[in-house]
Regions:
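A charged N-terminal "starter" segment
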Residues: 1-152, 158-171, 209-210, 214, ...
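C-terminal active-site-proximal or functional interface alpha/beta core segments in diverse enzymes
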Residues: 14, 230-355
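Glycine-rich tight-turn/loop motif centered on a GG-T
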Residues: 53-57, 125-126, 144-149, 185-196, ...
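Structured alpha-helical segments in the cores of large, soluble enzyme domains
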Residues: 67, 118, 131, 197-214, ...
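Conserved radical SAM core fold
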Residues: 92-96, 114-116, 136-139, 179-191, ...
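Short acidic, glycine/serine/threonine-rich loops at helix termini
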Residues: 96-97, 120-121, 140-144, 161-164, ...
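Non-cysteine beta-strand/loop elements that form the S-adenosyl-L-methionine
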Residues: 110-113, 131-135, 171-182, 213-220, ...
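Conserved anion-binding
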Residues: 154-214
Length: 355
C-alpha cells in the first residue's frame, strides 16, 4: 500500500504548521547582540525623532541601492538576460519605488491601486507586470490599452481578457501564472493554473490558439522567505519543461520565465531558529540554483529571466524608531515603547548607551 508522501515540518505542541513555531523556545532564536545605532545615512536619530516624532519609519537609500546592485550583479554576472521587477505590495512608498526605478527595476503590481501608483510614478505600461488573483474589468481594460504585461491567474480572468481584446488588431503579450510544487512545505496553492493536472498546459494552448493574444511569459511564485535555494532550481526546471511542451506541440517558444519573489533578507524574523546571518543563504546561492539550469540551454533558446524582488531589498533598509515611554518592574525590568502594536521587529538600542 502506498500513499502520498508529505515532507515533515517542525511543529509545536499546539499543532502549528509554521516552520518557525518551534523556534520560539530556541535559545538561539532571540537574535544576537547589536551595537547602538546613532544615525541613519548620516542623519542623527534624535534629530529625526525631534522633527517627525515617533513611532517613525525610516528607510536608508544607501542600503536600498546597495542591496539592489548586489542582487543585480549576482544574477547578471551568471545570466546576463535577467530583468528585475519591484514588488509594489512589499513597499509602495513613492521614494522607495522611485529609487528602484532609477536602479533599472520595472514595476510588479497586484491591484488597481498599485497599477495606478506605478503609472503615476512614471512607469510606462510595458514596464508593468500585473499579477494578482483578481483584476477588475476597468483596470484590466486600462492595462490592456497601455500595454502592460498581464499574468493571467484563472479561467474567468482569461475569458474576460479574451472578451476585452476581441477587437484588437495586434496580439497582446500575456503570461500565465503556474502553480507548481517546488518541494517546500507548506505549498502555496492560491496562485495560477495547476501544472500537475495539465491545467497550465491547457491554458497555454488556449492562448496560443487565440490570434489576439501572444503567450510571452510563464510565471510562478512559490512562497515567501524561502530558505532553500534548491526550490528555485526545481521551479525553473518545471517551467522549462512546460515551455518545451508548448514549443513541441504548438511551435511557440516563450520569451520569458518569471520566477517571482520570495528571496529572504537578513532581517531577523520572530521565532527564527538562529541568527539570520547563519540561517539565510546568500543571494548568490539562489542565483546559482536558477541560472545553472538556464545556462544548460542552447544560447538561442535561453529565455529572459525575470525576478520580482521585494523584502530581500527593502527589509534591511528599514528602521522603526520608537521612544521609551514607561519602565515597569513586573517579573523583570521591562521598557514599554510607543510602537507596541508593531511585531516581528528586531529590537535594537537606538541613540542610547550600548548594552
Amino acid at each position: 500500500v502506498t500513499q502520498d508522501y508529505s515532507q515533515p515540518i517542525i511543529s509545536d505542541e499546539l499543532g502549528s504548521n509554521s516552520p518557525h513555531a518551534a523556534a520560539e523556545r530556541n535559545c538561539f532564536a532571540r537574535g544576537v547582540h547589536t551595537p547602538a545605532l546613532f544615525e541613519i545615512d548620516g542623519n542623527p536619530i534624535p534629530a529625526l525623532v525631534a522633527d517627525f516624532g515617533s513611532p517613525l519609519f525610516v528607510f536608508s537609500e544607501h542600503t536600498l541601492r546597495s542591496k539592489a546592485r548586489h542582487a543585480r550583479e549576482a544574477f547578471r554576472r551568471r545570466y546576463p538576460k535577467t530583468s528585475f521587477a519591484w514588488s509594489f505590495k512589499t513597499n509602495h512608498l513613492q521614494s522607495v519605488c522611485q529609487i528602484l526605478r532609477q536602479e533599472g527595476w520595472i514595476a510588479e503590481v497586484v491591484s488597481d491601486f498599485e497599477y495606478e501608483k506605478a503609472r503615476y510614478l512614471g512607469f510606462a505600461g510595458p514596464d508593468i507586470v500585473f499579477n494578482g488573483p483578481y483584476k477588475p474589468r476597468a483596470i484590466l481594460r486600462r492595462a490592456i490599452d497601455e500595454g502592460a504585461l498581464l499574468h493571467i491567474d484563472n479561467w474567468d480572468e482569461l475569458s474576460l481578457i479574451e472578451e476585452l481584446t476581441r477587437d484588437r488588431r495586434e496580439p497582446l503579450d500575456v503570461g500565465i501564472r503556474v502553480w507548481l510544487d517546488a518541494g517546500i512545505r507548506p505549498v502555496w496553492s492560491k496562485f495560477g493554473f495547476a501544472l500537475a493536472n495539465g491545467e497550465a498546459e491547457r491554458a497555454a494552448e488556449r492562448i496560443v490558439k487565440n490570434p489576439r493574444l501572444r503567450l510571452h511569459t510563464l510565471h510562478t511564485h512559490i512562497g515567501t522567505y524561502i530558505l532553500e535555494p534548491s526550490a528555485y532550481r526545481t521551479a525553473t526546471q518545471k517551467l522549462l519543461a512546460l515551455r518545451d511542451t508548448i514549443q513541441r506541440k504548438h511551435g511557440h517558444l516563450l520569451d520569458c520565465l518569471d520566477l517571482g519573489g520570495g528571496f529572504p533578507s537578513n532581517s531577523l524574523l520572530h521565532g527564527m531558529a538562529g541568527p539570520a546571518e547563519q540561517v539565510v543563504p546568500p543571494i548568490e546561492a539562489y542565483a546559482d540554483a536558477i541560472t545553472d539550469v538556464l545556462n544548460r540551454l542552447p544560447e538561442k533558446k535561453r529565455p529572459l529571466l525575470r525576478l520580482e524582488t521585494g523584502r530581500h531589498l527593502v527589509d534591511e533598509a528599514g528602521y522603526l524608531l520608537t521612544s521609551v515611554v514607561a519602565v515597569k518592574g513586573i517579573h523583570r525590568q521591562r521598557a514599554e515603547n510607543d510602537g507596541l502594536s508593531a511585531r516581528d521587529f528586531k529590537e535594537q538600542l537606538i541613540a542610547g548607551e550600548d548594552s
